[in-house]
């Protein structure tokens, strides 16, 4: 029997690791048929709905904005913090965003008229709507766990159509040193944005 040389084992090991890492899928990805013709030049990130996870507020907005800017896919990226300031300064925008999100959350209806108002007031062609599903340190069966879960929807402001949505959850077990939730979130956002139409 012929023996396989050491360097060949290294190459095989690297390929296996690369294939396994590349196969990590997101928990949820849905892309509309219209995505193939959707190429916005500008995108706005609505402030993330962090729900009970107040520690994630602001952090996730900054992470998403930074990842979008680094892709260089868009001429303009209006981040969650910038849109939050615009909402505070403009009552019409505040009302439009509040009503739009309420309809989206309660009726699963993306109102095209409100999308157009938000688009005009913010100067954007697409809206990214992030939600923090989980952002915590917890105990499960006696194990210490760090968990981060994020969902996103990409909406075409011309039609109000949800072009893409994705969601993912990662957990990391630890003993002494807590993993940084922000680092876990950044890694997850990169994976999600990589799958987003642009």
Regions found by a protein language model. Give the residues of each.
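Bacterial N-terminal signal peptides that target proteins for export
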Residues: 1-11
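Generic short beta-strand segments
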Residues: 131-136
